[in-house]
Amino acid sequence: MTESVIYSGTSELISADEDNTETTRAHLLSFEQLQAQLKAQQELFQQQRELFNNDNVHTSSIPTLNHTWSFTQGLVVGQLSVIVVVAIFIKFFVFADSSATTTTTSSSNKDISGVIVKRNKNVRGTSNEDKDPNNNKEDDLNSPNLSKISTILEKTYYDVENHSPESLDWFNVLIAQTISQLRTEALLSDNIYHSLNEFLTNSDLPDYMDKIKLTEIDIGDDFPIFSNCRIKHSKDRSGRLEAKIDVDLSDTLTLGIETRLLLNHPRPLTAVLPVQLSVSIVRFSGCLTVALINTNDEEFLDLQNVTTPSPGPSNEPNSQNQTQQPTPVNNSSSRASHDVPSSSETKHSKAKRSQEDTGTALMFSFSPDYRLEFTVKSLIGSRAKLQDVPKISSLIESKLRSWFIERCIEPRFQVVKVPSLWPRRQNTREPVHSNANGIVDKTEEASI
């Protein structure tokens, strides 16, 4: 009984174990299935994740480009806005209003008068009651000039009435250097010979005179001496300041020529008379008057409007006195008194000439009590020669004196335009080489 019980218990235990084993196997199978499913799900999830990542990479590239383009647009818009703000600030806060530039002529003149500092003082003069009514207009015109001259004399401490004459030693040295340089250039390049020869060749000669040939040119070796300089008021109504300077020159300036006088009657070249002439200036002295004038002044324009009488020999006994009468002439361009512009000259050339003759100019003339000495040598004939004929000498000397009087003796004068003294770049020079003592050996133009 007991064995049956034990057997039955054992069988029950064995059956229970078998059940447990089957249950365990079932659980293991289900666990393996779950693991397989989980692994499959993980693989599927991994694939989905990879696909999702690929989709994210593809889709994220487009927003990045859009984001980059938006930043560029913002940068450009920002820069433009800054430029606009700066332009508005400069226009309205730095520059003036454009309407201010469109002012009238009167307001422009008013602004100019406010910029230029005028230091002219009112001139004290006599009342109109004490003046001649006929001279009121002239006095009104001359009063600014007289005031200016008085101011100059006052500020330079120069007394016209009591100032002693001055020597011009320094001026003599400068003039001597200039003349020496001109003589050197004339001797080296022979330009004085070529210019005189061209003038004589191109001159219109009468039919009875053959070609003129140069035989002697002597430009001298001495220099003029200027002395006894004094400043005086002009004798005319302008009252301008003039410098009176004594000039003395003792030198020999010679010009020698030879030609032939042709006798063409009754047939051409019937006879030929050789002529040799030599004219020398051996002494000149006189009082030189120098003044700076403005060619735009009314008094000078009045002188330009007066035509010069044609020079010619006068048979009247007082011809020399008539030459020295105060007849104003036009010597503004330092030409001969008979050089009157032809009627065929165009308006453009006249306007250009008038424009060139305006501005500051140097006026000079000599007093009538000058001294001019000549030495004239002549030789006429071929085989039998006449030497130093007095009549020929006096005729040539008279012509030369008349030529000089008609151009340079008061009241006539010569006018030389003064070049502009304003510093210019093209006139700038600089030393490029110097020796051990610091003396400049060579100069060249400064770079422009």
From Swiss-Prot:
Query: Which compartments is it annotated to reside in?
Result: Endoplasmic reticulum membrane
Q: Where is the composition biased (Low complexity)?
A: 313-332
GO cellular component, alphabetical, reads: endoplasmic reticulum membrane; ERMES complex
Which residue spans belong to the Lumenal compartment? 1-74
Describe its membrane topology. Answer: Single-pass type I membrane protein
Identify the Pfam families for this entry: MMM1
The answer on whether this UniProt entry bears the keyword Transit peptide reads no
Q: Which key words are in the record?
A: Endoplasmic reticulum, Lipid transport, Lipid-binding, Membrane, Transmembrane, Transmembrane helix, Transport
Question: What does the subunit comment say?
Answer: Homodimer. Component of the ER-mitochondria encounter structure (ERMES) or MDM complex, composed of MMM1, MDM10, MDM12 and MDM34. A MMM1 homodimer associates with one molecule of MDM12 on each side in a pairwise head-to-tail manner, and the SMP-LTD domains of MMM1 and MDM12 generate a continuous hydrophobic tunnel for phospholipid trafficking.
The record's listing under HAMAP family reads: Mmm1 (MF_03103)
Task: Provide the protein name.
Answer: Maintenance of mitochondrial morphology protein 1
The organism encoding this protein is Debaryomyces hansenii (strain ATCC 36239 / CBS 767 / BCRC 21394 / JCM 1990 / NBRC 0083 / IGC 2968) (Yeast)
